[in-house]
Amino acid sequence: MPKRKIAPNKESSRRTVSHDDLTPQIQEFQNLMDLESQKVENIRQSYSRQNSLLAKDNSILKIKVNSLEKKISQLVQENVTLRSKTSISEAIYRERLSNQLQVIENGIIQRFDEIFYMFENVRKNENLPSSSLRTMLKRTSSRSRSCSLSSPTYSKSYTRLSNHENNLSHESSFNKDDGPDLEPKAKKRKSSRRQSMFVSTSLEPEDETGENEPMMENSSVEVPAESHESAQVEETIDALNPEEENSDSVSNFTNSIIEYSIPEENPTEPEHSSSKLEIFNDSTNMLSTVPSNPLPLPLPGPSATLPTTTSDASTVYPSSSSSTNSHPKTKIKHSMKPPRIELKKKVIDEVMPVSNMSSNSEISFTRTRRTRGKAVDYTLPSLRAKMRRPSEKLVDATTVIDIHDLQVSKRNRETSHKRKSLSQDSIPDEPQLREVVVSKDYGTPKGKKTEDEIHEDTAHLMTTSNNNSNNKNEKKLTSNNSPKKSSPLLDITNKSENKKKSTRTKKLFKNAIVNNLSDENSTTRPSKSSKGTSNNNNNYNNFDNNNSNINNVNNKSVSFRLNEDDLAVFDLFGNGKAVKHQPKTYRTKK
């Protein structure tokens, strides 16, 4: 039974094996197809990416190319503008250069024409044949004149060239006459440079206006610069023939042409120009006095050539001759300064003696001025400390007379009164030797007191005085107001009353010897001092009543002089109060 079962299984297995062999081949083929399709898709995607990238790059490159094209177009435009600018600048430069060259050529032609015109005038004055070279420049002379008159550079250079040609003509004349003499050349050159002559604007050259216009039509010859120079040399060689007066006339005419060519010349100033000629012009007639100049100087030549300037020349030449005749008076520019200095010196000499006298009069018042403002109020004790009270050493330093020899005692007081009465005229010149001085009016006679009245007054005042320090001050005022014939020094220290106080006080000299009778500053002080003493001291009321005769003497123009230090004594009194302590500023005993 088992054999029958195995046989069908083998047939089924064969069938399955044959079916399984076909499926993997199909699968492989299918896989290959899938792979190929994927490869194709990948390749297509890569190409699409590349195309997109290339498109972007192309767009960027196109933008850059457009910008570059714009820049190139701008650069091309700039290049065109620069080329146009350079061409325009070159054209402008060439035009300016041509204009300048034309102006220079016209000016040079005009100058040579005028130089030839001078030579032609010389030839006419000397009756010489005219030169053929002058006709070369006639074509452009009138046109160049119209151009050159308006240019300032032409006027400057023309004056230089005309002066140079004028100097050449003068040198040729001197070489003909003198030979190697050089000093007249320098003088003539100097004078020809400084000589000036005004010509009115109506002046026109006679030859030039008539000859220029027809020669412009006929002559058509171009003259180079070398021909101008050769013509100038030939004309200068031909100019060696004229004489000296002709050269003078030529110089005057060239200067007139110079003045004519300057348009800003004022024709209303002939007097001012003549004054300049009088001062600054050198002696133009020096050549006439040179011994090597035997030729005369006829004047009708220039007057014939210049008929319009005869009046001006007649005004200029006398001024120049007067300037040469009065050469030391007007030649010097600063000749007016020394009179000013002399006038100043004269004023100083007249004024200085007055100032010296005033200074000498002030010398005697120096000490009063120095102590003027100190004694203002005599009642204040603080001012007393400020006042200067020199000691005995300072008195010796300020005086040459011994103070002790000038003291007066009782026994020689009478002789001193007699001596004073005999020598009244000598008192004003003597210096005052003490603080209290009696100044007299010497023009009127005074009533004289006797010596008995003097002693009575002094005795009465001595009895009415107090026993304190006011005794000394009263003695001083009695000596002030006592007789006219009192001595210059009154003895104060050698009194019997003062001997009682010798133990308390050591007295010194009060003040130096100042002030004489001529001092006016101290004459106003006795009134102040008398008022101050009557107000501050009650003990002097009876003194004024008892001395009425002394007041009568005061009314007879007798001025008592007191120093400031005398009035300082009354500061001790105060307002009627007794002073306990006295300052040690008084004289000592002898």
From Swiss-Prot:
PTM per Swiss-Prot/TrEMBL: Ubiquitinated by the anaphase promoting complex (APC) at the onset of anaphase, conducting to its degradation.
Positions in coiled-coil regions: 25-86
Compartmental location: Chromosome, Centromere; Chromosome, Centromere, Kinetochore; Cytoplasm, Cytoskeleton, Spindle pole
Chain intervals for the UniProt region annotation (Disordered): 1-20, 133-235, 291-337, 411-550
Alphabetical list of InterPro entries matching this protein: Shugoshin_C (IPR011515), Shugoshin_N (IPR011516)
GO BP, one annotated term: meiotic sister chromatid separation
Compositionally biased residues, Basic and acidic residues: 11-20, 173-185, 448-459
An annotated GO cellular component: kinetochore
Start-end of Low complexity biased regions: 302-326, 527-550
Residue ranges, compositional bias (Basic residues): 328-337
Keywords linked to the UniProt accession: Cell cycle, Cell division, Centromere, Chromosome, Chromosome partition, Coiled coil, Cytoplasm, Cytoskeleton, Kinetochore, Meiosis, Mitosis, Ubl conjugation
Stretch forming the signal peptide: none
Compositional bias per record (Polar residues), positions renumbered to this chain: 513-526
Family recorded in the similarity comment: Belongs to the shugoshin family.
Function: Plays a central role in chromosome cohesion during mitosis and meiosis divisions by preventing premature dissociation of cohesin complex from centromeres after prophase, when most of cohesin complex dissociates from chromosomes arms. Probably act by protecting REC8 and RAD21 from separase degradation during anaphase. Also acts as a spindle checkpoint component required for sensing tension between sister chromatids during mitosis, its degradation when they separate preventing cell cycle arrest and chromosome loss in anaphase, a time when sister chromatids are no longer under tension.
Name this protein carries in UniProt: Shugoshin
Species of origin: Saccharomyces cerevisiae (strain ATCC 204508 / S288c) (Baker's yeast)
Gene that this sequence comes from: SGO1
